[in-house]
Amino acid sequence: SHHAVTRQQWQVLCSSSLAAGCLRSGDLHWPTIGTDGEPVLIDLSSSDQLSAAQAAALLHEQTLTIARLAIRPRVLVVVGGDTLLALCRALGANSLISETAMDRPGWGCARLAGGIWDGLVCHTRSGAFGSENDFLEVISELQKNFRSS
C-alpha cells in the first residue's frame, strides 16, 4: 500500500528489533522463507505507482512465490483484504473459519480451511488505519503468546 498510515506502520516495524525479518517484495527469491523460526515480515507494496491491473498481477505473482517458498508459519498476519484473498487462493485455501480475534480495534481472526496451510490461524485487518505502532504491537503480542505457551 502507498497509503501514508500503512507506510508509517511498516517504517516503525522495520526500525524495531524485528528489522532483520523485514523483507521487501523484491526479496522473495530466497530458497526458503522463514527457516530460522523468527518472524518474516513481507511488505508486498510496489515502490512504483501501478494501475489496478498491474497491482493485481503483481500481488498474484507475489503470493504464488510465498506459497511456493515459505515454510508454514506458526501463525499468519495479513493486512489488506485483497492480499488475504490472493494469499488464500495461492495457498489453495477454500474458506476461512472464524476464530477469536485479538482484543484490538479492526483485527479479525480466522483459520484457513483447505490448501497447503490448512488449519493455520490468520490474524487480519483491512489496510490503512490504526496507530503507527499497530503492526509492531500485534507482532509483539503474538510472539509473547507463543513464548508463554
Feature map (PLM): residue ranges:
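Active-site catalytic microenvironments in core metabolic enzymes, especially phosphate/sugar-handling
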Residues: S1-S149
